[in-house]
């Protein structure tokens, strides 16, 4: 068996008619199948929930984020919501410290005019080297203070004295002395020791009454009456109930009548 040797063919020369050459090449290579739009099946198309890749639609992502945030405890959700809000805290106001000279000047103006006009406020602020807002605020506070002082007169003189008079501990002795003065006008009055008695000194009052009665009896009868100090456990009835030399100045002694 002999092998036929054929010389290699050179490049085929193309004719001037390109369409004829294209047809000849297509007939030699065989028919090629080109896909048509109808060849695509409905199953190969991605559905509404399927995408080409691992990405998910934004609606599904937002639903998952909402579900995840709902699982958080209430304090964390509150802090998460507050962290997104802007910081609306105001800076604290700075109080103006007036000097004594400024306060004296403002008080002098307030005594004449409690309300300032805009021109007067501007002039006063320029003279005192303050702002109009500071002048206006000071006058507002001063008017409120003046109103409180007018409503409560005690604010004018807080240390003028006590509001209530102290109780009189010498009412009994003074009434007794007045009665003795009416009975015996020439009897001397008792000294001021009754005014110096401390509160609650019952025996001191009795002693003063005894001395007053003794002095009155001596002036009436010519000799002093016997006065006995109170004994513990037995109240003293005073010298008015003791015996005396005359019936005009002494009362009968009390005893067991029955």
UniProtKB/Swiss-Prot annotation:
SMART domains: HOX. GO terms for cellular component: chromatin; nucleoplasm. GO terms for biological process: cell differentiation; positive regulation of transcription by RNA polymerase II; regulation of transcription by RNA polymerase II. Residues 1-32 have a biased composition (Polar residues). GO terms for molecular function: DNA-binding transcription activator activity, RNA polymerase II-specific; DNA-binding transcription factor activity, RNA polymerase II-specific; RNA polymerase II cis-regulatory region sequence-specific DNA binding; sequence-specific DNA binding; sequence-specific double-stranded DNA binding. Residues 1-93, 227-248 are annotated as: Disordered. Pfam families: Homeodomain. Residues 91-150 bind DNA. Keywords: Developmental protein, DNA-binding, Homeobox, Nucleus. The keyword DNA-binding applies. PROSITE patterns: HOMEOBOX_1 (PS00027), HOMEOBOX_2 (PS50071). SUPFAM superfamilies: Homeodomain-like. Expressed in bone marrow of patients recovering from chemotherapy. Also expressed in an erythroleukemia cell line. It is found in: Nucleus. May be involved in ventralization. This is Homeobox protein VENTX. It comes from Homo sapiens (Human). The lineage of its organism: Eukaryota, Metazoa, Chordata, Craniata, Vertebrata. The gene is VENTX.
